[in-house]
């Protein structure tokens, strides 16, 4: 069996790190098994779905290193769903209901007042053809419910009907179909709710494993029943824990600051996002891995906790920083070149500055300082005189890492300055900043000519 998984976002907004967690769980699961990854856009909600959101999702996934083997759109597959609807109707497994939302809410309250579970009582099954015609004459259109197999012969006499599956993340799971309402599969306007297209696509695309958030655990039972009603074997299921904000709120597409697009624009490294999204809330140590191969080697779905995990942006920033500061020049070179950081000193420059930056884009700022010089710096008269005296003591080239030590020793002997009084004015003159990379590393990159040009 070839493992085939899918990630099924709705293109109604930007995906966030919680969505990325699901995508990455699926991608890594397929990667380890030598399987396939399907990107399926759940865009049956034609009013809210936007192609620009779908395009952005593809960009976000590519940035994370996820390249689908197949991309499909539910909006192009309505014919398959209609065929499934007719099959279920013919089998007596899909029945029309005419209640309004207000009527259903009233029934729910009545059941609760009688200490009964607030599930649909299948009242629509009792409607005669005349009653249905009367409703339609009023202008009502039916929504269609899937008749769950939680009874022997009388649908009004339900009994405990257990659905079991061995969850690839949570282990053995059981749900009781008698504890849930018959799910609505088709709305009054003929559009489909999530469940039917999802199951039909999983069958048609040969999905072997459905890996998603644990908010879907309960409805897995109804979906397994729907697979069987359509004559198909249900795939394996896996349900990972969800991420929340640091305050415990659930993530949503409205949590814009946590969208993948915003994290990318903020300069966060993609492998920091991937590492944290996958490893947070598991028994694995949260470490920033350099690439997907490393992450896949440490990915263990069953290590996921059963409780939600809090996503802390500060932890993400720390992981991203650790990746930048450990990044070899070969990995950074293409991105540095795109910012104009290239040439014979690009590699020593990167090795000099990487330990002092949080985001790779900051390297461009230091490149400008090295090549063009800092903004003019204001000095006290004493510091200006000191810097000019120090610059008069600059040794001839060639310069290397020892040049800074030997130069500052001479300056110390000549001026009597030491410590901060010596180093701070020189750093400000050379870089315009109070802190930064080791000047022993920067000075050879500046060279004598560019250094003298910074004399105040």
UniProtKB/Swiss-Prot annotation:
The family note in this entry says: Belongs to the class-I aminoacyl-tRNA synthetase family. Glutamate--tRNA ligase type 1 subfamily.
| A Pfam short name | tRNA-synt_1c
| HAMAP family documented for this protein | Glu_tRNA_synth_type1
Note the superkingdom of the native organism: Bacteria
Q: Does the keyword Cytoplasm apply?
A: yes
InterPro entries according to UniProt = aa-tRNA-synth_I_cd-bd, aa-tRNA-synth_I_codon-bd_sub2, aa-tRNA-synth_I_CS, aa_tRNA-synth_I_cd-bd_sf, Glu-tRNA-ligase_bac/mito, Glu/Gln-tRNA-synth, Glu/Gln-tRNA-synth_Ib_cat-dom, GluQ/Sye
Under which EC number(s) is this enzyme classified?
Answer: 6.1.1.17
Protein name per Swiss-Prot or TrEMBL: Glutamate--tRNA ligase 1
Q: Where does ATP bind?
A: 253
Question: What is the scientific name of the source organism?
Answer: Chelativorans sp. (strain BNC1)
Q: Where in the cell is it found?
A: Cytoplasm
